[in-house]
UniProtKB/Swiss-Prot annotation:
Organism: Oncopeltus fasciatus (Large milkweed bug)
Protein name per the record: Tachykinin-related peptide 4
One Gene Ontology term, aspect cellular component: extracellular region
Keywords from the named record: Amidation, Neuropeptide, Secreted
Principal location class: secreted
């Protein structure tokens, strides 16, 4: 999901 990608990138 988009949230996982966002926090995973950080």
């Amino acid at each position: 999901n988009p949230a996982s990608g966002f926090f995973g990138m950080r």
